[in-house]
Amino acid sequence: MIEKEETMENKQDELKIMPRGAAPRSVRRGKNMIAVASGKGGVGKTWFSITLAHALSGYKQKTLLFDGDLGLANVDIQLGLMVKDDLGSVIAGSKTLNQVIHHCDKTRFDIIAGRSGSAGLASMPIGRLQILGEDLSLLASSYNKVILDMGAGVEKPVRILSSMAEKIIVLCTDEPTSLTDAYAFIKIMAMQYPKSDLNVVVNQANSIREGQRTYDTLLKACTNFLKINPPLLGIIRRDTRVRDAIRNQTPLINRFPTSEAAEDV
């Protein structure tokens, strides 16, 4: 639990966020685009993005998963894929987004892989990031759902691309650092992009009841300090079979379709 909610409020000084009146220009949100973000790394964001995309494809939703995790891209690794072209090729200007789409047979959805170890997105000017987001918005019209697996933290690329999604899912766990950083992400997005549709998913909960307590702690801080109430979309219970699936580079829904975590997603 968070001992002092004021520690969340003090994150403003560390983030050096823009004043409310200095928000970036209005953005064009891509219909059917869902950004998955978290203030802290290590909360299972990429696994959740993959599993969500897999679940949607199982309901005959044409789905694209975009790996936007900056220099720590690993969607293709978790899926056991070897891709020739990735987002790095798009940033370099040698390929278009359409040309780096790969179909994953084992999950029945498409992916745009990131490039691990590359600072490409992090170093892109704001204008090019916005163009990339607009290209993604156009691409989204060819799909029922596009999942954006964003990097941890509140860096510029994460904020800009997340703002272009129709819905933002903030993933957190019960760890105090995860809750504090999730609050920081919600705060900066709410201030810079007040029309953002922010939602919460609690991951790795020991039980549904504990997951609800985790959400209530975050909600209390958001209500008291930000005057907003991001809704809870769901709680995913802690499941040791998730680690097994990741180690075997096999989607959880394929390997353990009746597991608690798979059912919760």
Language model: regions and residue ranges:
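Inter-motif core of Ras-like GTPase G domains
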Residues: L138-S141, E155-P176
